[in-house]
UniProtKB/Swiss-Prot annotation:
Protein name per its UniProtKB record: DNA mismatch repair protein MutS
Binding-site positions, ATP: 609-616
Coiled-coil region: none
GO cellular component terms, semicolon-separated: cytosol
A Gene Ontology biological process term: mismatch repair
Function: This protein is involved in the repair of mismatches in DNA. It is possible that it carries out the mismatch recognition step. This protein has a weak ATPase activity.
Pfam hit, one: MutS_I
Originating gene: mutS
Superkingdom of this protein's organism: Bacteria
GO molecular function: ATP binding; ATP-dependent DNA damage sensor activity; damaged DNA binding; mismatched DNA binding
Family: Belongs to the DNA mismatch repair MutS family.
Naturally occurring in which organism (per UniProt): Enterococcus faecalis (strain ATCC 700802 / V583)
Amino acid sequence: MPQKTKNTPMMEQYLSIKAQYKDAFLFYRLGDFYELFYEDAINAAQILELTLTSRNRNADDPIPMCGVPYHAAQGYIDTLIEQGYKVAICEQVEDPKTTKGMVKREVVQLVTPGTVMNSKGLEAKDNNYLTAVLTDGNQFGFAYVDLSTGELKTAVLADEEGVLNEASALQTKEMVLGSGIPESLKENLSLRLNIIFSTQETVEENAEFSFLTNELINPLEIEITGKLLSYLSVTQKRSLSHIQKAVEYQPDHFLKMDHYSKFNLELSQSIRTGQKKGTLLWLLDETKTAMGGRLLKQWLDRPLIQERQIKARQEMVQSLLNAYFERLDLQAALTNVYDLERLAGRVAFGSVNGRDLIQLRTSLEQVPTIRQLIVGINQGEWDDLLVDLNPVEDLVALIATAINEEAPLQITEGKVIKDGYNDQLDEYRDAMRNGKQWLAELEAKERQETGIKNLKIGYNRVFGYFIEITKSNLANLEEGKYERKQTLANAERFITPELKELERLILEAEEKSVELEYQLFLAVREQVKTNIDRLQTLAKTISAVDVLQSFATISERYQYVRPTLRSNTKNLAIVEGRHPVVEKVLGHQEYIPNSIRMNPETDILLITGPNMSGKSTYMRQLALTVVMAQIGCFVPAESAEMPIFDQIFTRIGASDDLIAGQSTFMVEMMEANQALRHATPNSLILFDELGRGTATYDGMALAQAIIEYIHREVQAKTLFSTHYHELTVLDETLKGLKNIHVGAVEKDGEVVFLHKMMEGPADKSYGIHVAKIAGLPSPLLERAATILSALEAEETTIPISVHHEEVSEVHEETEQLSLFKEVSTEELSVIDTLKKMNLLEMTPLDALNMLHQLQKRI
């Protein structure tokens, strides 16, 4: 980089500002362009596909540069933000026309992935959360804000896993790091999320911030919320009056699902595509507003665990189901509601334009209709919500009176304020309209006097108004009649005192009109700004109405039923349940329903059956039904009674975490560990083919030990599918375990999967038949069948040793599975060691390590 002594004053100014924003692209305003220099220019040219040029190109050390027009800059900024970069916008804060010397410039906003306000850079139905975290060495203070909507929440989290789960649920793109954050947490966040880290060293002393945090008690929450607000203040450099008071939330007050469980269940993101399609959110989303869509996703992320709250939502859904025509009218009204949350945010932020205010007015005009429809169906269940569903008639009247229906996007170029709103503005506009008439009359008069029929009066910004005469007609012009102003190739341009006086009147009226109109718009915006709290409350209420009508619409379309949930029961009975997403995907094809019954004494369903027969679908079906029920939606079944679960843990599918360098088996053990450590008797555990990622005996031993541990220690409702058919004898010794299987029949040498759950264990796995369906070569399948027959002829039973107070000691004579006709002395020693191992007193990891050592001896 050149020495400062060689730089021009302008480049000195640039370098001084850039030094304050080293981690951002600096968009430096020069006239009608934003220019980038040095490394910023080189990198931006590549990312944005701009032409890279240089400043002082003939010098020994030319400065790389590129630029974008200021009126088109937003698209380029959005591209950089989407790719995880920050952009510092540096504007001219003095008028170059009235400034002597260097124009003062300063950064007016630092745009980051977590602070996007431009609507084109935001997905309508997705929140854009900026998060912050710090630790005192024992716990973590955590806070998040959506700058576009003003939502601000904070919590104290127990451990790193809690931070990871919250950050993943929020899909945060940027996190402000406080003190003491472990490197392990940063690494895990980077692996799991496309995230950038920012820092904020100080907490601003600010009366506005104190007001936003004055209801918080925990010091960690106060500190981290202060850091988050300070970061917003430093980066945005403007009013944050739309930020709502910080609300403390506790993850334990909602149904908890860790990152793995949400991923496995495909609540909002498809495992295969990473998109919304094919997820529970995709199924349930019949919302008509953007803010309703965002609230639906928030409800999915945090299902309820309070029976009263769940029933309150169910009552409102039921009332909408019972009022078909009112629901249609409600949907029509909601369709005309724009994004009130983000409109309110842009008002406070100072980025709202005339069209935004028209959208705001249109939205507010729907409120009386929405309220009337809700009042008409209300039997008491809507009372709490109706308190906040009030029209804002004064704002509607203000905007209707002041803002032009066809207002342009720019607020500094006129045509924003309606005629009749301001007398002075009307006078200026009359002068402008009369001026045009005066010009037309003057043009006609000059044509008459000169006899030149194609004489015309024109205008440009350099010369103002002028009379233009073609060169072929100059001979007909009286000498000295006009003052020559400009010579063109085919014409001459002239002015007269009368024309200049008209120009003064017209341009003065135009200039004053635009300036007055801008000031009037700002005044209207300030009046709207005083109603931010009312608008945000109204937005939340309409969002809830929208989500509830979406539930009613889906429930009617797919004939869902209202589930019965009780917090004091262990009885689970879902009759003829269906997987909601699979049912939608199948469309008109027949879906085979399945019931799930677990009485208070049954904690574990051990599921066996053929591969591809529907075991995983059955397990996901239960989890999704639970989630739907606990967000207040109806469920796909003939009837449903269930307890209220506090947590869901899943291990479904072979989703190797290859990026993190973790194998299938390691991921299995990590996910199993989460359930075994944190599950309670009120939790739901779903383990699909646990143990398949390692050697057969290792996997079988761990699977059995985990089943026994859940039965004895955890006592949570558990669905455990397995291909280890030897485990089905556990029902003889574990009273809380019940065998079920997926039915299949053989007909003419072919296997037909019934996709129907039946009591008892499966008798075969039908693996060769699945291989046949997959198209493996016939000779290979025939050989596999021969080998299978030979193995089955030699097979005996596996030792099942259950260490439990209620089970008598297993006799030494228990038969054992032998794959070889002769067993070596070393192998007998290993078997003896296995017999003596007390699996129930070992963690899964201890068992795995021991098995690894034994495996080395064979």
